[in-house]
Amino acid sequence: MKKGIVRNILSVKYDSYKSEYWVFFGQSKNESRIIVYNKKWQKLKIIGENHFNFRAISSVFFKNHVLWFMNNPNGNSFVIKYDRDSELLQKGFEFPGPVWYSFSSDNRYFL
């Protein structure tokens, strides 16, 4: 990544289904992005960039899809569903503001 592209790494999550790291970046809309890396930290792909859809801190991984929770400082945030096969995005539930943290326990998920 070029110097000066982003100021903040919001979170780094390990995807145990694919053995990859998902890195969530963003301070401003233009700095927001999700990039996937392998275990050697080589960039595999950019899921999306330059939109608050790709500014998140919390995410949950499943076999066929990935969910993340937008952290939009300027408006409403949504659950975003990424389909692994088609690479399509789908907006889900709308939150009244940014989502900061989530955790899972015994296949239950909490925001």
Task: List each language-model region with its residue ranges.
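Trp- and S/T/G-rich repeat-edge/linker motifs of beta-rich repeat architectures
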Residues: 1-2, 39-53, 81-100
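Repeated scaffold domains used in trafficking and secretory/extracellular systems
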Residues: 6-11, 51-63, 93-109
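Recurrent small/Gly-Pro-centered beta-turn motifs in extracellular repeat architectures
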Residues: 23-27, 69-72
